[in-house]
Amino acid sequence: MLLALKITPQRSTQYAQLTASLAAPELLASPLHTMIHEVQPITLAGQSYLLATVDDTCLSDAMTVKILYRLGAISEVYEYFEQIGDVLGPLLRPVEPQFTSFVPLEMAEVRRYKGKTNEIFTRVLLNVALFAGNYANSSTQRIRILDPLAGGGTMLFAALASGYDAFGIELERQDVETTAVFVRQYLEGEHIHFREVDERARKAGRRYQFEVGSKGDTRHLVLVHGDCSAANLHMREVAGGPRVHAIVGDLPYGIQHFGEISDLLSRSLPIWEQMLLPGGTIALAWNATRIKRTEMMEVIQKGTQLQVRNDPPYTQFEHAVDRVIKKRDIIVAVKDI
């Protein structure tokens, strides 16, 4: 069977190239990789696609289709035919989505702020984190995601849209406060039911806890003002405590020298490792223009017992961002079960 997977369209050529470079490794990191025989980029009617040769049974499982529509770099899925009867192709038959976002995906898109990470890359990073661990197909657990470098909350909104509980820690108090304001305004504007809990912590400016969704089907969205290296302390009083399935973050791009990144990670990684559930993962993106992958691997291996995924496709996410960040990469490490 052939599938044509449309690469998520972008506003600019720069982001279109970024998304195209992420699409194949994201797909191959997914649980579907055992069904995939070949993947190649193609262009149909001026649009970029991946043409994937897959098992004939690929679409018979609703979970498989759900994963396809969870992919950040893929927006539409079609069966591909060279010919049907006497009609020459290529011909595409749409595959009905099996994934409905918990909140609109646009929640991660509409807010603009300085230093924001592209929302498509954010979704890819989140997916890759879960694909690498023991919870990629979990349908029995409420997945809990921590972004210890939350910034303006893009990762949190992507996680919430995927139906996960989302927890963010940010050192800049103003970022936490403005993000909390945005959350209230967006949810109210979209008529999405929510309530705030933990009023005392909110008034102190330390923590904002939102319970999003209708009764019986809610998710937690938590914003904490604090240092990422004390994540376990900040998470002690939130719903469910400090244990999480994945820790996903985008390291500060302004840091040009490895010493600063090394210091940040050396302080934080042992704490983050303790917070991970068995089979959980840490996935970090960083400016690889000056900091090598081997250096990132070394600091993770020195400070933790986590297993770095240094095999394809996890070594194939390097891509250009802009004129300043000529290389960005992803590193993923897994906690033993």
Predicted regions and their residues:
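Class I S-adenosyl-L-methionine-dependent methyltransferase catalytic core
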Residues: 2-26, 67-73, 84-146, 150-337
